Amino acid sequence: MQTEVTCPAGTIVGVERDGVRAFESIPYSRIVGAFDDPLPAEQGLLIDASVPRPGTASLSVTTPGTAKPGADHPVVVWIHGGRFEHGDHTETFTNPDDFARAGVVQVRVGYRLKFPGFLPLHTDAPGHYRGVADCAEALSWIQRNIEAFGGDPTNVTVVGQSAGAAIALWLARRDHYKGEFRRVLAMSPAFPRAPFESRKWATRGALSTPLTREALNQLYRDNEPKMQRGYQRFRTQYITDCALGPHPLDATELAEVDLVVTSTREEFIGHGAALDRAHLG
């Protein structure tokens, strides 16, 4: 059954099923160039959020079917993992329907990956990564709009796994934290073991282009497959590590927010099962 929410972002049309409302792949930002910082999404739009559409600058919201504006349900923001190079906000193994039936609004956030998301540029501020900036823009969108979905913007928990946990912790740094979430649950956070400066030569060799915003935006526009091939060449040199990602995390730089850092015992069990299903194990 069709359902809709009207909020500052616009009128968002989703679906209601089995006591749960789902709003899929809502754009939360505008990305002019692949290596540019995100801009806030346009407001006042009519948005078809009835089906998931993979995309980096989108998020999905799942709410209890009875949620009304101002209901103040707690909000869980899920940032997916994937070694900073794969994953998507459309993943549903986080069981959003179960969260909704328990009275929790869940938001799943997509962000830029690989070189567009995590290749530092010399003109960037220290500690700045576009993939992290995407997630920060998503949190700002949530602050502006989630109350219309029945969520409480003052009771937001950011949850991440692997690369997503690293991003969650990075967002909790004092130079990034803007008070848009109350607590963090970081499960098996994964960071590169070496700074990007030690890998810059490999990046230049893989892309054969200057590492400037203008040159990289041009390469992405003109020949995205070449950039993807370049990333594959680059990352094969770091198969036992995250090839890119925030680095380094200093715990003394974290803001005063409630924080749980833990590990997941069976986070890779699905990989073996997938290989078995494909008869590759």
Can you annotate each of these PLM segments?
Residues M1-P126, R265-E267:
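Non-catalytic accessory segments of hydrolases
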Residues T56, P126-E147:
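Alpha/beta-hydrolase active-site loop
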Residues R130-D134, S162-I167:
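Active-site loop->helix "elbow" adjoining a glycine-rich segment at hydrolase catalytic centers
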Residues G160-A163, S188:
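Catalytic nucleophile serine of serine hydrolases
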